[in-house]
Amino acid sequence: MLDLKRIRTDFDTVAAKLKNRGVSEDTLTHLKELDEKRRTLLVQSEELKAERNIASAAIAQAKRQKEDATQQIADMQKVSADIKTIDNQLVAIDQQVTDIITVLPNTPHDSVPVGADEEDNVEIRRWGTPRDFNFEVKAHWDLGEDLDILDWERGAKVTGARFLFYKNLGARLERALYNFMLDEHIKEGYQEIITPYMVNHDSMFGTGQYPKFKEDTFELADTNFVLIPTAEVPLTNYYRGEILDGKELPIYFTAMSPSFRSEAGSAGRDTRGLIRLHQFHKVEMVKFAKPEESYQELEKMTANAENILQKLGLPYRVISLCTGDMGFSAAKTYDLEVWIPAQNTYREISSCSNTEDFQARRAQIRYRDEADGKVKLLHTLNGSGLAVGRTVAAILENYQNEDGSVTIPEVLRPYMGGETVISPK
């Protein structure tokens, strides 16, 4: 959530930044007008309360002196009625301010490229060279069925579209991947966490999914619970409402969890395969950092995600998302896109973001600065390290052989009991 004081004192800068994120200046102007009216009413309310206190004292004195206080009482009742009217106005204005400010996206960092959509994203670097196949490559969904390791037909029967069963070495490959990813992140100083897979609405507000993106989630009927769309939500909210010791920062968390997404608005996109599912495993990275260190931590987090792809030998590129393509809470985002041979393109496999103090303000996560003893908002960061199903897709396609088998990447073999290849039955 944005700082209302910042909008008030630096309106033009905030308006220009949010314009690049698709927010009309009229929206901010209306917010500013509401804020000004609110502040005026607060002053009036305080003045009337002071007047009421004086009147109350005068009434008390008149009664002590056995004097008639009828007029003073009538005057005080009128003042009290005026205060109640103003307070009701303030409640209504506060709700309007909340309705606007809670759906405003974060302001982009100055280094973020300005653009409307993914066409305006900027490639930063590439790693690895896509393999030159001397045979016709298969899509990962065909490989999965031919190898009897992925079953979409029964997934659809048991649940519905965008669900599947992992089987045999497919299930083992998925498990090997997330164990490998977690182990690599732990080496880099991340604390492993097993989170709840359901969170409450306050947690969804804290990380920015609510109220704007409720349609993208699965809520449990007649409860306050939501299935997590990412482990970012429980990990970030771990410290919601707390004040941390500045000497403890930065703090790194990592977790593997299922993620549940309704994929509203994705009809017709990636209807086959592992790219877009309603339920998938993802290894998440979350950091809590001091403001002056958060962009250095973003570079480190991105490198942690890249490390996984490099050790798996998967070609990828790093993209800096433009203002029009970033997520709601992000101030800056790097996407990692892995090479998918059957599609002859790179597809997103990780997204690493610095939200600055946007989530921390919503969730009230603060720290006491050891330098001056003041309590301040910290910065939160999150990143995929990696989306496991998409990594399976990338391995199946990049490591496929002409005979229909798939070679298991060397770093995963210790996690798979020494298996080296997945062969057709």
Swiss-Prot record:
The keyword Ligase applies. Keywords: Aminoacyl-tRNA synthetase, ATP-binding, Cytoplasm, Ligase, Nucleotide-binding, Protein biosynthesis. GO terms for biological process: selenocysteine biosynthetic process; seryl-tRNA aminoacylation. Its EC number is 6.1.1.11. GO terms for cellular component: cytoplasm. L-serine binds at T230, A231, E232, E284, S384. Pathway: Aminoacyl-tRNA biosynthesis; selenocysteinyl-tRNA(Sec) biosynthesis; L-seryl-tRNA(Sec) from L-serine and tRNA(Sec): step 1/1. InterPro entries: aa-tRNA-synt_IIb, aa-tRNA-synth_II, aa-tRNA-synth_II/BPL/LPL, Ser-tRNA-ligase_type_1, Ser-tRNA-synth_1_N, SerRS_1_N_sf, SerRS_core, tRNA-bd_arm. Gene3D superfamilies: Bira Bifunctional Protein, Domain 2, Serine-tRNA synthetase, tRNA binding domain. It comes from the Bacteria. The keyword Lyase does not apply. It catalyses: tRNA(Ser) + L-serine + ATP = L-seryl-tRNA(Ser) + AMP + diphosphate + H(+); tRNA(Sec) + L-serine + ATP = L-seryl-tRNA(Sec) + AMP + diphosphate + H(+). It is found in: Cytoplasm. ATP binds at R261, S262, E263, E348, I349, S350, S351. Consists of two distinct domains, a catalytic core and a N-terminal extension that is involved in tRNA binding. Catalyzes the attachment of serine to tRNA(Ser). Is also able to aminoacylate tRNA(Sec) with serine, to form the misacylated tRNA L-seryl-tRNA(Sec), which will be further converted into selenocysteinyl-tRNA(Sec). Belongs to the class-II aminoacyl-tRNA synthetase family. Type-1 seryl-tRNA synthetase subfamily. Homodimer. The tRNA molecule binds across the dimer. This is Serine--tRNA ligase. It comes from Streptococcus pyogenes serotype M12 (strain MGAS2096).
